[in-house]
Each structure stands twice: as structure tokens, then as C-alpha cells.
Amino acid sequence: MATSYNVISPEVPQHYPPFSLSRLLTTVFHPKGGERVCILIDLDDPTKVKDFAFLNDPQWSIQRYAHDVFYNGLKNGVSQELNFQGGEFYAYQITGGSNLDMPDAAFAPDGRQLSFEKDIYPHYDLILCISTFSATAPLTAWAKKFGFRGATMHGMNQTILETGLSVDYDTVSAEAEKLRLGMTRADWVEIDFAINGNTHTLRLVLNGQEAQKSHGLCRGPEPDIANLPAGEIYYTPEGAEGEFPLKNEHDGTLSLTKVSGGRIVDVSFISGNEETVKAHQQKLREDPATGDLGELGFGTQLLPFSGRDIQDEKIRGTIHVATGRNDHLGGGFTPDKFKKAINATHDDILFAPHKTPEINIAQVRMQRDGKQEILIENYLPAAYMKSLVE
């Protein structure tokens, strides 16, 4: 029976090529042969990697994909086909937050404890991280220090495997570049959020900066980390003003954030649990850097919703802003800006019809080259955005 996917528009395909680990690694990395590769996962108790004991616990479904699809895939032919070396599997203590720095301790299935900095980063050319929490930011920093390449694929599920990791990333890259060229060097972007009959507008100041793309290709000698599934145009805002509604991921509480000077400075209650809003207010008071708006991102791909932000933020018609660190994106919000290390996260706030049905993205517009262009209306690409990829 054919799988029926949840899509944002009829333009999204319902059929994709079968997943191929060999094709994915070849397209993303263009390996020359001889590269030493390893796989990383996160666990609440990383010693559970011994004898792959974590496979007996159904809560580690993401990590099971790392073992069943990637580790076994390499071992059962892909390493030989691509002339890879290694193929080892390591676990580390789960960080508990998106893009928090990783611990140095790594654990192997044979029970050994190793050091990432001494035993792993210097000795691998390609590192694949399949985890619960994103490790893109810390791995990007380590890649620059030690010269390896890699990919982060947090939150993996079957839909992601069958769709977002099965597409042709040469095509994804080409389309992302077309969109980037039509959106780069914008002066600002304004987003109109509609909720409960009211419209709230957030302006993100870009000052003509060069737009960047997450396009899935990580080729050549330069150290880099691809975030997969890919397909995104993004900026690191230089300022922001206005307000926007926020839906809490844990309990669905809706609040209205006030933004000034590029950061969230206050938050007020709309509906749900008032204690959730009070906790957010307290966090902003204690560690103001947690409110910094470090990213504005637009999805570029025609993909189905997976229920995981890692894919869903890459869908054309969705938009996300992110708070916190953005050094992995070329921004200046580094972990040392935060009063508490545990707060130095990069948290995407995704607006998509399946995730935030209470909030409509009525319009997104861009000021560029002296004129305004409408990019998105009601979660669908507007004529200008469509024209960039036709």
C-alpha cells in the first residue's frame, strides 16, 4: 500500500526514489575513497551503547536508525563500495538542548570510554551524527579545528528517511541557489502573524547581508557540517523590532513576544498555561541572551511534513526564526554570551500549518533593491518566490 504523506500543497510529490545510503553519501560528500568514517548517537546513559543494549529500548528510535540503516548499511557493503575506512559507532551523553556543546566523553560498543578531542575528531574524515538533539553548532566548531567533514541528522524518522534523505541533493542545491540569488542582500524582511483576529508584525533587519543556503552538499577539502535534510535560505539578522506569537512546544501555550533591539525583551500570555509564560519571562530576565534572534530561515524544498522540525523547516512556504547561538551560521552569538552554559542553545521557532495552526503567516515581504517583494502568503510561496525556481 502506497504511503500517503501530509503535504503543504498539491505540488509536493507523493513518490520518492527508494532511500540509498550509498547515493546519499556520494551526493553529499563526493568522497574520493579512503575516508575514515564514524557514526555518533546521543543517549541518556551512553554506556548503553555497550553491546548495542540501547536497541532493546523502544524510546531510542532515532538512534536505532543510526544503527540499522547507517552502521549496518556501511558494514554490509556501502563502505566497501565507497572505499571507506572505519565505520565505528560511538555514543555520548545527551545534551538536553538544541546545539548545546557536547561532552568530551564518548563510549564504544566494546565498552571503551574515549575522548572526542583526542581519539575521534583528529582521526576521522567524515562524521555522521544521528541524534535526538541537534549537534550542528558544536560539530561545526570542532570540524573547523580538526579539519573533518560531516552531517547532522537529528530527529530521524521513517518519513524523513523515505523523503528528505531520498531526494537528489544536486537538484536541492540548484533550487536553493536560485532562491538565494533572488533573496540575497535584502534590507529587511517583515512577517505578518495573524492570531485570534489580530495581526502582529515582526521586522528583521538584514542591512543588505548576503543570504546563505543550507543545501546539503559538503564537498571538497574544506571542513564543514551539512545539516540533513537540507533546503533552506537563511540570514543572521542584525536587528529586529516588533512582536510575534509563540507556541510552546511542550504544552501548546500561546504567548506574544515583544522584540526590541534584536531580542525578545518581554512575553505576555495569550492562552494555555500562565506558568509557562512566567517561566519564559524569568528566563529572559536571568539570561537575556536567550532572547536574541539569531536566524531567519525559509524552506526551499517541496517535501511532506515529517512531524520533526529538521525536515519541516526545509519545506517551501514555512518560515522560522531562531533564538540563541548562531556562531555555526556565521553570526556573533557565541556560547560565552550566555550567563548559563545550559542556555547556550540554538532553538528554531517554526511556523508551519501542521505545527502552528493557531497562527497564520498572513504575509512575508522583503525590501530589496529599493522595492518590496511578497515572498509568502498564508503558508504558500507567493508569485515572486515561485518565479525564482520556475
Annotate each predicted stretch with a short phrase.
Residues A186, G252, V259, I264, ...:
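A broad structural signal for short, well-ordered beta-strand segments within beta-sheet-rich domains
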Residues I233-K278:
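Oxyanion-binding "anion nests"
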Residues A240, T253, D292, I315-G317, ...:
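A generic structural signal for well-ordered coil/turn residues at beta-strand boundaries
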